[in-house]
Amino acid sequence: MSFSVVIPARYASQRLPGKPLQLISGKPMIEHVYNCAQRSAASRVVVATDDQRVFDAVTGFGGDVLMTSAEHPSGTDRLQEVVSQLKLGDDEIIVNVQGDEPLIPAEVINQVARNLQSNSAASAATLCEPITAFEDVINPNVVKVVCDDQNFAHYFSRAPIPWDRDVYAKFGTHSANQISTAHSATRRHIGIYAYRVALLHQFVLWPSGVLENIEKLEQLRIIANGLKIHVQDACAEVPGGVDTPEDLSRVRVRFGDI
């Protein structure tokens, strides 16, 4: 299995400025993500950034990094620039590991690449995991996914999907019964993707769709254009990424900093 990992890392963040360079156990967060990716079976790991400070930090720890445009409307557009700079072939597989996932397991990176490689009908692959807390079900920052019987994604949403009409009608929306009954089929989408390079070149030519603009979920553009995303349950726990100062504190606790 041959694949490359690209780690998009933007310095600007409304909720956590300078996020890639926030220190965890004395190292910038982006270095932890890079090291996780290096432990996978990837033939190459490269950071894609639009900020000189991130570029310098990555070169400082000996990592591979590319400078990209600051004008990209989405992370997928940034990936397309990277594969163009690297002159990768249409059939090659790229795994997009988010730059705010310092605890991403290497085996999960391998899994999503293998998932795409073994599903020729899919143009992309991603992962999910069961939701076990009702607060996650109703949290719009926790993206949910529903799939068909072949595990191709039907839809991604910030809303609680699927909605069990009968259980909610019986127990209401604040009952502990909801987790064991109404949400046994509810899956949290894990934001790691494997793409065939050809899809990335197509993606940047498509306009954003109505549902993508409503949900603010760019993966919906792939489904809207008739292509398939294959989804598997992750083979290992994937701790949430770092979006807020509270998330950063949680990760620092996991590293023993606090």
From Swiss-Prot:
GO MF terms, alphabetically ordered: 3-deoxy-manno-octulosonate cytidylyltransferase activity
GO (cellular component) term, any one: cytosol
Biological or metabolic pathway of the protein: Nucleotide-sugar biosynthesis; CMP-3-deoxy-D-manno-octulosonate biosynthesis; CMP-3-deoxy-D-manno-octulosonate from 3-deoxy-D-manno-octulosonate and CTP: step 1/1; Bacterial outer membrane biogenesis; lipopolysaccharide biosynthesis
Protein keywords: Cytoplasm, Lipopolysaccharide biosynthesis, Nucleotidyltransferase, Transferase
Subcellular location: Cytoplasm
Catalytic activity as recorded in UniProt: 3-deoxy-alpha-D-manno-oct-2-ulosonate + CTP = CMP-3-deoxy-beta-D-manno-octulosonate + diphosphate
GO biological-process terms attached to the record: CMP-keto-3-deoxy-D-manno-octulosonic acid biosynthetic process; lipopolysaccharide biosynthetic process
Annotated disulfide bonds: none
EC number: 2.7.7.38
Protein purpose: Activates KDO (a required 8-carbon sugar) for incorporation into bacterial lipopolysaccharide in Gram-negative bacteria.
Family statement drawn from the similarity comment of this UniProt entry: Belongs to the KdsB family.
Alphabetical list of HAMAP family matching this protein: KdsB
Stated name of the protein: 3-deoxy-manno-octulosonate cytidylyltransferase
Organism: Teredinibacter turnerae (strain ATCC 39867 / T7901)
Organism lineage string: Bacteria, Pseudomonadati, Pseudomonadota, Gammaproteobacteria, Cellvibrionales
